[in-house]
Amino acid sequence: MFLNKIQQRKSGVLLYGITPPKSQTPPEKVVEIAQRTLERLHNLDIDALVVYDVQDESARTTEERPFPFVTALDPFEFSVNHLHTLKISKIIYRPAGKFTKDELAAWLDGLHKHNFYPVFVGVPAPDFKVKTSLTEAYQIWSKNKGTSVIGAVTIPERHAVLKDEDIRIMDKMNSGVSFFVSQCVFDVDFAKKVIEDLSASCIMHGKELPTIIFTITACGSIKTLEFMEWLGIHIPDPLKSELKASENILAKSLEVCIEIAAELIKYCSSKSVPFGFNVESVAIRKEEIEASIFLTNKIGSMLKEAGIRK
């Protein structure tokens, strides 16, 4: 059970991440998409399903977005209305700053009623007028801390520049956050540096390490590669060249993802860090969706072989 694993700081947590259908999708098509999603997930050995809140981040950069932004259905409503037969925990993302305190309180009550767990994220642009701060949002959630858990995001790329991700994580831990889901990892050294510095900071301050969940995503095309970079995901130049030169970029990226997972399993185990993985499936191409299922099963097997996942 996801809640118990996070509360007990058990390693081997395995998540699968999706985005809801586009908001202009006809209702009958939404039902069809949800049914296909359920068919894929019912036999998948995962602890929880992550449902992302899709935001337009164009304002944070002057670079042109490789794919046009399209709004998506509300992740909580999509989960409640269409994914209720999937009897696993749901983790719902939400940008806290876009909502008032009353709106967030009502939303959190709805999540708690359904045994869903929130992950609060920042607003899509630096100049966005914030209605509720993250600190305030965590305070609103805190009434449920005895029977729930709350997550946040961690961005290894940010740590590579600002060198303060360990401090950011510890600040959120002080607000009750017990698990952190990373941005997609393609630079394993960036991810390991966050763990190294966080581990040192926790030891220094006498705190237990939180659960770190690494997001892993296969890349099926050059366009997707460009989009990942636009999102701020760092792909080392040698790896980027290797992927671009590959005859089958999807197959090559799967190899890379498995190598990254193996290295992180070994590293986190050596550091006694509670950890897990979140395999993203945000593409619409059948091949990429099937690749995400393969990757989830593969990483699950790797965790079991290492004696980490039961």
Language model features with spans:
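Ligand/cofactor pocket segment of small-molecule handling proteins
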Residues: 146-187
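Glycine-rich phosphate-binding active-site loops on the catalytic face of alpha/beta enzymes
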Residues: 118-126, 174-190, 240, 277-284
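Short acidic, glycine/proline-enriched helix-loop-strand junctions
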Residues: 134, 139-141, 193-213
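Catalytic-face loop-and-helix region of soluble metabolic enzyme cores
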Residues: 207-274
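Glycine-enriched alpha-helix->loop->beta-strand junction motifs that scaffold or abut catalytic
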Residues: 45, 86-88, 112-117, 145-147, ...
